[in-house]
């Protein structure tokens, strides 16, 4: 594995800020020099009546965690683009994954070890399944009864199955469709060696139609000498509701969805 450490940045109102929200983000946003204790007091005050509570929905949890000004700058519109669902109807667990730090640590994760497969995920997966006891079948439709490894045949044979697809599809939508989000990617090529200077750039403002952009070469700085110094590839992510036949990425998981299944 490489020694890659994941860091994310966000644009808001013409400026670039470090994520997750940390003391650097707070001081830059408020043009201040708060100490950790001062920043904690500030955020608690800006959380208002939600301070010290444990809200169940994303909107209130976001305000409780980082105060209303930071929530409206970095989370509200980004969430609107990503989910197209009123934040008050989304579970708080979505934003609980985003840490808030009252220091200058801008690592996205707190794991002891981080890294990416040195030869890429394809080589990594190929090694994992390189065993005579493992057979990989591609292009198989689990729900097509004309194919050997289909749901009906495997169930009749009593074969244990770990199904990782949409649960509503598994039950043939007999209880209705769940809401899922999917992502469309737009590839953009730039005639420059590095466009963002980081692997992931979030776009927090509503006037930018995509949620974030990924610049792949920045995931592998150890390959810098072998990369094209005059070209770079960026993928912009556009989030929308998934329809049947789309690849679902995220369950919306509203109370209505949870009540179905």
Report the location of each language-model feature.
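Aromatic side chains
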Residues: 9, 71-74, 78, 83, ...
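Conserved FAD-binding subdomain of flavin-dependent enzymes
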Residues: 1-4
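Short linear motifs in exposed loops
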Residues: 20-21
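Active-site/ligand-binding neighborhood in enzyme catalytic cores
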Residues: 6-7, 15, 24-159
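Mid-domain catalytic core of redox enzymes
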Residues: 140-261
């Amino acid at each position: 594995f490489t020694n890659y450490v994941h860091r994310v940045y966000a644009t808001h109102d013409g400026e670039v800020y470090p994520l997750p929200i940390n003391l650097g983000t707070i001081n830059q946003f408020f043009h201040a020099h708060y100490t950790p204790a001062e920043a904690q007091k500030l955020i608690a005050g800006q959380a208002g009546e939600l301070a010290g509570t444990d809200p169940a929905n994303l909107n209130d949890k976001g305000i409780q965690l980082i105060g209303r000004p930071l929530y409206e700058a970095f989370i509200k519109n980004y969430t609107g683009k990503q989910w197209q669902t009123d934040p008050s109807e989304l579970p708080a667990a979505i934003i609980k994954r985003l840490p808030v730090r009252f220091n200058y640590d801008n690592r996205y994760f707190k794991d002891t070890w981080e890294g990416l497969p040195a030869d890429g995920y394809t080589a990594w997966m190929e090694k994992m399944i390189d065993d005579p006891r493992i057979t990989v079948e591609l292009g198989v439709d689990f729900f097509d009864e004309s194919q050997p490894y289909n749901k009906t045949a495997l169930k009749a044979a009593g074969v244990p199955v770990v199904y990782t697809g949409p649960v509503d599809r598994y039950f043939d939508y007999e209880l209705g469709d769940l809401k899922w989000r999917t992502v469309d990617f737009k590839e953009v090529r730039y005639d420059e060696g590095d466009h963002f200077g980081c692997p992931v750039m979030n776009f927090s403002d509503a006037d930018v139609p995509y949620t974030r952009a990924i610049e792949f070469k920045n995931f592998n700085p150890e390959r810098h000498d072998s990369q094209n110094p005059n070209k770079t590839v960026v993928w912009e992510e556009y989030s929308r509701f998934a329809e049947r036949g789309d690849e679902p990425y995220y369950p919306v998981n509203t109370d209505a969805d949870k009540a179905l299944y």
